[in-house]
Amino acid sequence: MLPPREVVRLAHATGCTLLALTDHDHTGGLAEARAEAAALGMGFVNGVEISVTWRHRSVHIVGLDFDIENEALQNLLAQVRQGRLKRLAAIAAKLEKKGIVGAYDGALALAANPEMVSRTHIADYLIQAGHVRNKAQAFSKYLGDGKPASVAHEWASLEDCVAAIKGAGGLAVIAHPMRYGFSATAKRNLFEEFKALGGDGIEVHSGNCDKNDRLNYALLAERFGLMAGCGSDFHRLGDYSGGTLGACPELPPDCKPVWASFQTA
């Protein structure tokens, strides 16, 4: 896992001039990232990616350009992080019933930030302990929906998430909407509800999505009166499940970029 300053340096090396660091449910790296961006002459805005439950489905909402000291936002993020630990304990208890011990402590030991522990870290522990060969098997055998160690989890509500971001003076953007596998009806319902709650935009490009995705979501952004975001979805070096740092192509014509509304960049 790269420290925030290294992420900023890598972005700078790609020619990136404006950056938002959007760790999941945590803002602890923003001060370090902002200082490094300033030293390199880059624009920087505060960011965070918040886990949300919407109609029993998991959705991620990116908050941008907000006041990091806002108490309501920080309280919401703390609640989400505490929920991760509660879920880990429940999963570990189910695994123990299957004869797999040590998952709680093992997953925490593998997480760079214990507050940000996830099923991926549990999968890493299962691999390390020799219970499965790879992450795919960890999810298909134990951790996936409906499997023996599956634990449903309620993240923040969409309403509370958007309210917290807006209350902190920020912009709320739906992250990587092309990755959820939603039907056309579900997408319409999500975008309409998000807009009605005060949401600002959707990511028109994210990670490794293709040109057709960009054009499709640009049209959807225009249709629902939402601004367009663009993110690389970079997670770590060598992890190709996201995207390449700094790889954000130009937005399709007629998009209103979310960064045009930034106040602190």
Language-model features: locations:
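Catalytic core of soluble alpha/beta enzymes
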Residues: 232-265
